[in-house]
Curated annotation (Swiss-Prot):
Protein name: Trigger factor
EC number: 5.2.1.8
Subcellular location: Cytoplasm
PROSITE patterns assigned to the protein according to its UniProt record, in alphabetical order: FKBP_PPIASE
Gene: tig
SS bond list: none
Predominant location category: cytoplasm
GO BP, one annotated term: protein unfolding
Length: 432
């Protein structure tokens, strides 16, 4: 076997391989012998068909199959010999085959980039230092009460957290615009659903009033014809409602799985959940900075084949989220996913190199801890832990999570890490 390797462009490679004629003929004869043992031809007993007849009838197809098999096997031998690491499926380019002559063909493919991690010491990471305070727990209890609140109609003016029912008609330069009109529209104030200034214009008005508010659409508004435009909205305020928050009664508290129904028990459960959420948020915040720094410090070429493969994964995930099928997934424009796919491939390659250079393996104690932490959010943690322990795929996924965490820690060990005190709300708002 003769092999030559050339770089076509970037990560592209072209391997040219020549297979000796006698190797081909030996393989063809061997396969024809196997065929002769199995075929049935009228006038001959099974296994007794003369080889010249077998060759005459099956020679062309056997030769084609043998060539395909030899091309594949010789390519594998070639990349092992040349220490080449292909990324994605190879493209075979057959040459012209002439019986009795050597056969030359080419294989085109991309290789993984050679990565030499650099400048890890320049990566800057700010680690949030946060404690869950009594005030944070109070705020979370208020949020829980608001989620369970009922609405009661009131006579007074609309406030920042009231709910209003309105009719409205919007216009720009005196002309109504598409999507700018609604009847019996229910708006819970304070949630940021409307454009800036809209809710402020409603505050202070009472049910039964009709009025006009002036607003300006943001420059980044989704409708091109409305970006940055001044608009007027004619409002008919039909109803104003205020929240009625439930008291922290025993029955109310038991809805959240606190068996004794006590306020102290609810506060303890809320604090535990907040601390678990906080731990994950700090971990994600630090991880995202470390990965961002790793990517910025190491500019690498990415095989197009890996990006294409990742785009297909993202397409299928998107289709599943919206109830689509395989065919619909592949019809989604690749441009929607290309940037995200490239980013995921780059991160995967760089973290893979961190794992390789540091000879990391998944720490089983860490895997166990991750599963226990995740299971603690469920009603029966033991059942969840047992379910994971019996499912190889889930365990492998969790090992990958642990290994990625270990890789991030290896990056952090060389990075410049500073600590910054912050509050629970500030950190959670950054995560949103």
């Amino acid at each position: 076997m003769q092999v030559s390797v050339e770089t076509t462009q970037g990560l592209g490679r072209r391997v040219t391989i020549t297979i000796a004629a006698d190797s081909i003929e030996t393989a063809v004869k061997s396969e024809l012998v196997n065929v002769a043992k199995k075929v049935r031809i009228d006038g001959f007993r099974k296994g007794k068909v003369p080889m010249n007849i077998v060759a005459q009838r099956y020679g062309a197809s056997v030769r084609q199959d043998v060539l395909g098999d030899l091309m594949s096997r010789h390519f594998i031998d070639a990349i092992i010999k040349e220490k080449i690491n292909p990324a994605g499926a190879p493209n075979y380019v057959p040459g012209e085959y002439k019986p009795g002559e050597d056969f030359t063909y080419a294989v085109e493919f991309e290789v993984y980039p050679e990565i030499e991690l650099k400048d890890l010491e320049t990566i800057e990471v700010e680690k949030p230092i946060v404690e869950v305070t009594d005030a944070d727990v109070d705020m979370m209890l208020d949020t829980l009460r608001k989620q369970q609140a009922t609405w009661k109609e009131k006579d007074g003016a609309a406030d920042a957290e009231d709910r209003v029912t309105i009719d409205f008609t919007g216009s720009v330069d005196g002309e109504e615009f598409e999507g700018g009109k609604a009847s019996d529209f229910v708006l819970a104030m304070g949630q940021g659903r409307m454009i800036p200034g809209f809710e402020d214009g409603i505050k202070g008005h009472k049910a039964g009033e009709e009025f006009t508010i002036d607003v300006t659409f943001p420059e980044d508004y989704h409708a091109e014809n409305l970006k940055g435009k001044a608009a007027k909205f004619a409002i008919n305020l039909k109803k104003v409602e205020e929240r009625e928050l439930p008291e922290l009664t025993e029955d109310f508290i038991k809805r959240f799985g606190v068996e004794d129904g006590s306020v102290e028990g609810l506060r303890a459960e809320v604090r535990k959940n907040m601390e678990r959420e906080l731990k994950g948020a700090v971990r994600n915040r630090v991880k995202s900075q470390a990965i961002e720094g790793l990517v910025k410090a190491n500019d690498i070429d990415v095989p197009a084949a890996l990006i294409d493969s990742e785009i297909d994964v993202l397409r299928r995930q998107a289709a599943q989220r919206f109830g689509g099928n395989e065919k619909q997934a592949l019809e989604l424009p690749r441009e929607l996913f290309e940037e995200q796919a490239k980013r995921r491939v780059v991160v995967g390659l760089l973290l893979g190199e961190v794992i390789r250079t540091n000879e990391l393996k998944a720490d089983e104690e860490r895997v166990k801890g991750l599963i226990e932490e995740m299971a603690s959010a469920y009603e029966d943690p033991k059942e969840v832990i047992e379910f994971y322990s019996k499912n190889k795929e889930l365990m492998d996924n969790m090992r990958n999570v642990a290994l990625e965490e270990q890789a991030v820690e290896a990056v952090l060990a060389k990075a410049k890490v500073t600590e910054k005190e912050t509050t629970f709300n500030e950190l959670m708002n950054q995560q949103a």
